Structure formats: C-alpha cells, structure tokens
Curated annotation (Swiss-Prot):
Recorded catalytic activity of this chain's protein: 2-O-(alpha-D-mannosyl)-3-phosphoglycerate + H2O = (2R)-2-O-(alpha-D-mannosyl)-glycerate + phosphate
Organism: Escherichia coli O17:K52:H18 (strain UMN026 / ExPEC)
The name this protein goes by in its record: Mannosyl-3-phosphoglycerate phosphatase
Recorded GO CC terms: cytosol
Residues where Mg(2+) binds: D13, D15, D214
Length: 271
C-alpha cells in the first residue's frame, strides 16, 4: 500500500518528466509538489543537468535544501542538514569534467570523430539550442564530472566512439536532447542508492521509493525504485525495464508534468 504518510522518497527526472520538454513548464505538477512538501516527503531531482542548473530549479520548485542528483549521477548535492557527511556539500564520483574534456579532444583530433560539446560554444549558442535564457544557459556549462555534446557523425562511428570511451573508463549516455560522457562507474542508480541508504541510516528505516522518468537514461534509476512511473516521452527508444510488473510500474498516457501528475494520481489512488 503506497501512502503519502509512510516514509517515502520521490526521485524525479526533469526535462520531459517534471518539466515540459519545450516550454519547461511544471505547473500541472504543482498541486502534487505542494502535497508532498506538506507531508514532508522529499522530492529528489535527478538529471543530466549541472548542479548549478538544478539548484536554481530546485529553488523555483520549492524543493531547496533537499539532496539532488546531477550529471546523470556523477554528482550528488547533499541535503543542507547533512553537513557532517564527508564531502559536503557535493560528492563527485570518478573522472572530472576537465579530464573527460581532454580525452574527448584527443579522440576528436586523432580519430576524427565529429561532435560539438557545450565547451566548444558560448552561452548564446546553448540558449538557442535549448530555449533557455542566456543566464540559465550559462549554468549548463558548469559541469564538474561530465561533458554534454551533440553527436554529428554516423551511427557506425558512434559505436566505435562508445567502444573507445569504454576502453578509457567512460560511458556514453543518451539524454532527452543531448549525449553525455561520464565516468563508467557513475550512474543515477548508484547515486539514488547512496541517498536511500543515507536516509535509512539517519531514520533507522528504509524509505519506500517512487521514481519518475521518461528517457533511456532514466532506466537505471527506475530499476532500483520500489515503484516507477514511465512518463510518455519524445525519445523513440523509450524506457524498458527488466521488471515491468504493473503493480510496480505505470506508463502514463500524458507527457511531461501532465504525465508526472498522472503517475502520482495512479499510485496514490490505486494502492
């Protein structure tokens, strides 16, 4: 029985899930965000975005002070009250942004792969790509443990590129709009498990978990959740989980924040 009163954590992707993919609107989800906040249920944002972007969005959504997962799990922003935890305020796993950038530049120069990273362009270009304001676009460039890029080569070359990255201890991950390179050991699932374990250690009881996402890069997160909402998305590959028991997994009919609301309506009324 899923109840808003029980110890509960909600993990949510942003673009295409809690935020509309085009307008970044989140208002359809606002009533549920208010209910969860009033019930002291943490909503933990989990995204490919930088921690700087996510802290801005966290404040806008009324979720400030809570932990969050940035850069597809390579960065964990700790909760404000977790100041005694080693690494406060952020835990960064694996290879740094600067080191990844060096690897990518070498691969591009020596093996002639075609791609454009966010480091190659200015904030005005990123604003044009994303529809963000220039000030928000500037926050997208503050990577700490990953690189975001647009792939401009063939599928065959992408397979070769992915293999080369794996050989170098890196992974190539598809997001809602862009591709991301990060340490092979990092992931939304590992970051979520760390946060769950921290809440369990602090409270003495493992919280029930509900995750929401819309893209292939959300699958690892949703796999480790007790309950999962797969929000109808734009990505042609979709999201496929090993365990799609309908008692555990709900696929929405609506997209973005409308689907986010639909998913919460389903689990809190159906259980």
């Amino acid at each position: 029985m899923l109840s808003i009163q029980q110890p509960l954590l909600v993990f949510s992707d942003l673009d295409g899930t809690l935020l509309d993919s085009h307008s970044y609107d989140w208002q359809p989800a606002a009533p549920w965000l208010s209910r969860l906040r009033e019930a002291n249920v943490p909503v933990i944002l989990c995204s490919s975005k930088t921690s700087a972007e996510m802290l801005y969005l966290q404040k806008m959504l009324g979720l400030q002070g809570l932990p969050l997962i940035a850069e597809n799990g390579a960065v964990i922003q700790l909760a404000e009250q977790w100041q005694d935890i080693d690494g406060f305020p952020r835990i960064i796993s694996g290879i740094s942004h600067g080191e990844i950038s060096q690897v990518l530049n070498t691969l591009r120069e020596k093996e002639h792969f075609k791609f454009t990273t966010f480091d190659d362009v200015d904030d005005a270009t990123i604003a044009e790509w994303t529809g963000l304001s220039r000030s928000q676009a500037a926050l997208t460039q503050l990577h700490e443990a990953s690189v975001t890029l647009i792939w401009r080569d063939s599928d065959e070359r992408m397979a070769q590129f992915t293999t080369r990255l794996h050989e170098l201890g890196l992974q190539f991950m598809q997001g809602a709009r862009f591709w991301h390179v990060l340490d092979a050991s990092a992931g939304k699932d590992q970051a979520a498990n760390w946060i769950i374990a921290t809440y369990q250690q602090l409270s003495g009881k493992r919280p029930t978990t509900l995750g929401l996402g819309d893209g292939p890069n959300d699958a690892p997160l949703l796999e480790v959740m007790d309950y999962a909402v797969i929000v109808k998305g734009l990505n042609r590959e979709g999201v496929h989980l090993h365990d799609e028991d309908p008692a555990r997994v709900w696929r929405t009919q609506r997209e973005g924040p409308e689907g986010w609301r639909e998913g919460l309506d389903h689990f809190f009324s159906a259980h």
